[in-house]
């Protein structure tokens, strides 16, 4: 039996599983949206005041698409991808359970990196590392999991992934390109 509901075209569903502009506008207040946009567009640090609202919005958006878990997704130096999956479900004793993603858990994840593959790059006892959300790459939902793009660094600040050096390079190129453009009388907030 054929459904009476019309099938959506690829153009209508394009970007549906990405926490992009349309989802941000729908799930965030205007003030928080503007602050997050500045973070993304200008490479600014995320305002800690908005992290809880962004986390709640991202969680609600992901759940609406069938997600039950989230992971800080990164590319370690091993040439693979990695992430630790966490459930949104959080038990509350006698009261049952709630679905939760805190601002802190959105911004920083996995304080003990001993569970991540290293290809012998470090000893397990030196495995204290952190994932940090990279808001310049959009979060997305795939197969019931919210993937939060992240960088991976050691507790001493050493890069343990392939993305952090790329982001540093983009920042350096942006700074120098803006400097050169200024010499020619053009100013801008961001080039890349």
Region locations from a protein language model:
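Short, functional N-terminal and low-complexity linear motifs
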Residues: 2-6, 24-26, 57, 139-148
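Active-site-facing alpha/beta catalytic cores
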Residues: 2-17, 22-28, 176, 180-192
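Active-site core of metal-dependent hydrolases
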Residues: 8-127
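Glycine-rich, acidic/polar active-site loops that bind/position phosphate-bearing ligands
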Residues: 128-192
């Amino acid at each position: 039996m054929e459904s009476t509901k019309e099938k959506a075209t690829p153009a209508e569903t394009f970007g549906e599983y990405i926490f992009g502009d349309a989802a941000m506008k729908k799930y965030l207040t205007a003030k928080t949206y503007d602050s997050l946009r500045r973070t993304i567009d200008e490479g600014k640090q995320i305002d800690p005041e908005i992290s809880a609202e962004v986390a709640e919005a991202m969680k609600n958006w992901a759940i609406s698409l069938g997600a039950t878990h989230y992971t800080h997704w990164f590319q370690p130096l091993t040439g693979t991808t990695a992430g630790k999956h966490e459930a949104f479900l959080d038990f509350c004793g006698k009261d049952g359970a709630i679905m939760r993603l805190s601002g802190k858990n959105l911004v920083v994840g996995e304080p003990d990196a001993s569970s991540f593959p290293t290809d012998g790059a470090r000893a397990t006892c030196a495995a204290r590392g952190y994932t940090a959300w990279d808001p310049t790459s959009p979060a997305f939902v795939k197969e019931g999991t919210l993937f939060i793009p992240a960088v991976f660094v050691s507790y001493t600040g050493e890069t343990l992934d392939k993305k952090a050096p790329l982001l540093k390079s983009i920042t350096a190129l942006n700074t120098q390109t803006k400097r050169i453009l200024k010499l020619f009388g053009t100013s801008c907030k961001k080039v890349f």
